[in-house]
Amino acid sequence: MRALVIDDSRTMRRIIVGVLRSLGFDTLEAADGREALDVLESGVQVDLACIDWNMPVMNGLEFVLAARANREWRDVTLMMVTTESEHGQIVRALAAGAHEYLIKPFTADAIREKLQLLGLVEWEVSA
């Protein structure tokens, strides 16, 4: 599986990439929504996009709307990973087409659990 991490913070991208790689994902990075659309437009297959909300050029909500408007990208799972914690913002993102919403700061376990709920990571069965 391949994930696209979209965040204007290089440090945050590294953190999320590290978690995703530990879960078996190949990763790509983009610093804003426009750069992320360029990745998708290049034809690279992406299974998951982890999206920050507050970015220059094109913010996360604009990216979600653009991704959902293109039939070729409808199978990409979109997960917001952002500091935006107001209920209205969460509702807007989910209504726009995001599948899941994770508020920063987060733990690696929180990302894993969200991906398990989305069916992208297998549930661990304890013996």
Please place each PLM-identified region on the residue numbering.
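Receiver (REC) domain active-site loop signature in two-component systems and cognate sites
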Residues: M55
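Short hydrophobic/Thr-rich beta-strand motif most characteristic of the beta2 strand and flanking loop
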Residues: G24-A31, V39
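Short, glycine/charged-rich "phosphate-handling" switch motifs in NTP-dependent
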Residues: H99
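C-terminal output helix
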Residues: F106-L115
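Active-site beta3 strand of CheY-like receiver
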Residues: V44-C50
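Charged docking surfaces used in two-component/phosphorelay signaling
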Residues: R14-S22
